[in-house]
């Protein structure tokens, strides 16, 4: 089915207000969920909303909590999220990193005691739209086996890097081949994964999303490389925020809350003039996109460039929502 942006935001707002969330908080949160979905990231927008409400109802998320600054060291700050709403807090933290970067050239905010930030790419994009390089990542509950193991002991720990090119170039990737949200998107659509995404119950690589969702044997991105990167991202976020590691979140909490996150902004224009910046970025993009294609019918992609078209299509033709997901939201 298709809905308009206003219908989608209104549905989110209704559910939030029914939980006695303050009007301004409910409006801002509903706006972010709707924008994420409108951008084509259904896995961390509309599809994630029922899970968000479940955690809200369980008390994992404290909607009236206010993040507090703990430590300030010039370009580096440490904050405690107080388990406030994840996407609103993350937006505020990237805004703060940008403010620090405007003063120091670079700004880093380390956040502890946070909740799931939904679409991490929103915060990298937020920085790039203002002319900054945006880098951020989060740890999570243990949902992926480290390389060589069968048992989940590491997080998917998504990493975002956004560049202020035209259009914005952005990598938004979990340390697994696919996020659990994308496994759900493919399962609901009745599709196999385009490449292997995990192991089946016999330890064989599989493209079946439902099998991986069930047994939790998701495949690290780049095999041992994604496993290793997940581990060091967790270590950095834990140390800089003085927050919880994947091990602590998994062993001490009843669900995924109280995670640690990093937000970095770099003001490029303090290092290079605008014309030179644009020319260098354009040369990089042109060099890549003019390569001989492996398949004449498949364009060479630059990361993040597809979002402009996805957003335009959804604004023109309406936002496609899976019927079962929409039914869940209506029932909340």
From Swiss-Prot:
Query: What keywords is this UniProt entry annotated with?
Result: Cytoplasm, NAD, Oxidoreductase
Q: What InterPro entries is this protein classified in?
A: Diketo_gul_Rdtase, Mal/L-sulf/L-lact_DH-like_ah, Mal/L-sulf/L-lact_DH-like_NADP, Mal/L-sulfo/L-lacto_DH-like_sf, Malate/L-lactate_DH-like
Where does the chain bind NAD(+)?
Answer: 168-174, 224-225, 304-306
Q: Name one GO molecular function term.
A: NAD+ binding
- Gene3D superfamilies annotated for this entry? 1.10.1530.10, Hypothetical oxidoreductase yiak, domain 2 (3.30.1370.60), Hypothetical oxidoreductase yiak, domain 3 (3.30.60.50)
Q: Which reaction does it catalyse?
A: 3-dehydro-L-gulonate + NAD(+) = 2,3-dioxo-L-gulonate + NADH + H(+); 3-dehydro-L-gulonate + NADP(+) = 2,3-dioxo-L-gulonate + NADPH + H(+)
Q: Which residues form a coiled coil?
A: none
Q: One GO cellular component term, please give it.
A: cytoplasm
Q: Which residues form the active site?
A: 44 (proton donor)
Q: What EC class does the entry list?
A: oxidoreductase
The source's superkingdom equals Bacteria
Q: Which family does it belong to?
A: Belongs to the LDH2/MDH2 oxidoreductase family. DlgD subfamily.
Complex formation = Homodimer.
Tell me, what does this protein do in biology?
Catalyzes the reduction of 2,3-diketo-L-gulonate in the presence of NADH, to form 3-keto-L-gulonate.
PANTHER family according to UniProt: 2,3-DIKETO-L-GULONATE REDUCTASE, OXIDOREDUCTASE-RELATED
Q: Which NCBIfam families match?
A: PRK13260.1
What is the protein named? 2,3-diketo-L-gulonate reductase
Q: What is the lineage of its organism?
A: Bacteria, Pseudomonadati, Pseudomonadota, Gammaproteobacteria, Enterobacterales
Q: Which gene encodes it?
A: dlgD
